[in-house]
């Protein structure tokens, strides 16, 4: 792992009783310094973030610009908005091995994860700062989940703001 990698990690329980956030009125733009720092974090292991392989926070911002900000389970919506406003990719670690990949959407598309920091379970890689595996995504039946904010020490103040916001919200769960 990069010495600059500074994750926020939460293990949470969700009973579905709390409302999720509203989509932001205006679509926040991710500042260039944030994009640069997050992409540098991904490049550490040799991954090349671009196109479909860009950080999840950038994909989310683009979806928002295009009016494609779907409403999904409130807990996922909450972290999508935190990602959108902070610019940090957020997933629910090791570097991906050569040839390792996982399906990230219902149509079966794969993300090659060689060189990326990945979350794994007994079945293999399950998430990364680019996309999460389809088989491990949170849905309406999810009660317990794991969240990672893929932060970097270069943006410590911004990460502290995210931590305070998430701590405040999760203290009510």
Language-model-detected regions and their locations in the chain:
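Charge-biased, low-complexity intrinsically disordered regions
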Residues: 1-173
């Amino acid at each position: 792992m990069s010495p600059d990698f500074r994750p926020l990690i939460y293990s949470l329980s969700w009973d579905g009783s709390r409302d999720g956030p509203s989509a932001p009125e205006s679509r926040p733009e991710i500042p260039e310094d944030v994009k640069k720092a997050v992409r540098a974090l991904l490049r550490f292991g040799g991954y090349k973030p671009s196109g479909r392989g860009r950080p999840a926070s950038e994909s989310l911002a683009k979806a928002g610009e295009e009016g494609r900000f779907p409403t999904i389970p409130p807990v996922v919506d909450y972290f999508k908005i935190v990602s959108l406003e902070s610019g940090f990719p957020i997933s629910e670690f090791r570097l991906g091995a050569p040839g390792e990949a996982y399906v990230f959407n219902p149509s079966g598309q794969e993300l090659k994860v060689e060189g990326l920091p990945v979350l794994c379970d007994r079945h293999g890689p399950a998430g990364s700062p680019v996309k999460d595996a389809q088989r491990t995504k949170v849905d309406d039946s999810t009660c317990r989940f794991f969240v990672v904010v893929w932060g970097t020490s270069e943006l410590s103040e911004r990460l502290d703001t995210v931590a305070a916001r998430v701590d405040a919200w999760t203290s009510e769960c």
